Amino acid sequence: IIYDKTMNIKNIDLFILSINILFFIYYSFQLLVFTDEFALRNIGSFNHAIAGLSEILGIIFLSLSIGLIIILYKGIENQLPLFITILLIQLIISLNFWRYILTNSPGESDLFTISINALIFSFCSLLTILFIFNNKKYL
């Protein structure tokens, strides 16, 4: 568990990790279980290439959520590479969604769905940045 000097759980860190775990579990579940529906709803089209890439991304998200769950029990010491990886994934995906919005080119999907995903990924990116700066001496 993540502790401060008095050996109490730092609530903000527990909140941020919990949000990130739920975020990755939600998207991995959507990508792995509802691959077809998720691709149609969020990408706008479906074929086997999209399904394969969606499943790979779901596996990556599931792995990251499991890693964060393990960190809840083992601690965050020396886990900076994992948190930088999580931040980069969230940030790059959110920037990609914002690019679709700013250029008004949703492709086969709609701007509302892309906007929701952009906001979710941006929010989680900001939380991860906050977590990294809040714990930089432990990472």
Indicate residue ranges for each PLM-predicted region:
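Cytosolic juxtamembrane helix and N-cap/initiation of the first transmembrane helix
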Residues: 2-24, 139
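Hydrophobic transmembrane helix segments
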Residues: 19-59
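Non-cytosolic membrane-interface motifs at loop->transmembrane helix junctions
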Residues: 42-49, 106-118
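Core segments of alpha-helical transmembrane spans in multipass integral membrane proteins
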Residues: 50-72, 88-95
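Alpha-helical transmembrane segments of polytopic membrane proteins
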Residues: 51-60, 112-122
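Hydrophobic alpha-helical membrane segments
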Residues: 82-101, 118-125
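Membrane-helix boundary connector in multi-pass membrane proteins
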Residues: 95-115, 134
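Membrane-water interface at the C-terminal end of transmembrane alpha helices
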Residues: 120-139
